[in-house]
């Protein structure tokens, strides 16, 4: 009786996207044709009903590869209209909104295009005006690449350090709450290792057969996986460049500017190239993708994030090329403005999907070893 009451309560509080995932999963659980495609379907088979936590877990476990859509006999125009990628994408947006910190800022996910545009305007205006205030002009005699003659190191470290730490802290607070609600128990080292491998290799963007995802049609391609790798590892190389440069400054006492063949500059250059190739490729695929894949309402969020990553790299490489010229001030202001816009939107844009997906992958690694109820206090 208590189980029935629980199901009734859950049914009454499901949002429309959550209810659609529940409907789709009930049909898929009866069919199971797609069981070998990715982690979603084996995880689905461990359940007879789908509560809110299950729905959000499965939605974030889905990588939107599209294989199940093109293999499904019940996909549109069938009257069942089973479209797993679309249902999961719509539920993921609910995840981001419901677990946003502070909660009121969850609405920014639905207005991500406007949010990115405003953040970009604020960031660019801030640093262009700041450069004018500190130097009196955006054009100056060549400064031999010394950025700190325009913006003091302490000012940049304080501004960007505080914004980045706050953004990651807010994002992690939501992910931790998500993790606790899907109740997977405490992960072991082998489970963490497997989830990390699956995340870093993007295992579930191979379509379940190694040939890749579906994009514009039912043809398989590994391009989305490749462009994601360029983007992620390009970002991580740029982050590594910042970490190394910070170590040079605070530990070794070596102040910028660093020569081109120094470790920070080489890491940043390679990362920047990756952040040009990856986002450009992802945007190209996004523009070509079948309208049946994913949620069309999220395209502004997807494209806004892609654009910010691309502009971060483009302005950074332009700054490197022009750092010994009289235009370094304006190039630096443009680059810092774009980076600030990226940092400001990290907790309320597409960046969040990587964190929630990693949590779902870790849950799956725990679940397939120990069962669905591993760590659940009520079971």
From Swiss-Prot:
GO terms for molecular function: 4 iron, 4 sulfur cluster binding; metal ion binding. One of its GO terms (biological process) is citrate metabolic process. Keywords: 4Fe-4S, Citrate utilization, Iron, Iron-sulfur, Metal-binding. The keyword Kinase does not apply. [4Fe-4S] cluster 1 binds at residues 28, 31, 34, 72. It comes from the Bacteria. [4Fe-4S] cluster 2 binds at residues 38, 62, 65, 68. InterPro entries: Citrate_utilization_prot_B, NarG-like_sf. This is Citrate utilization protein B.
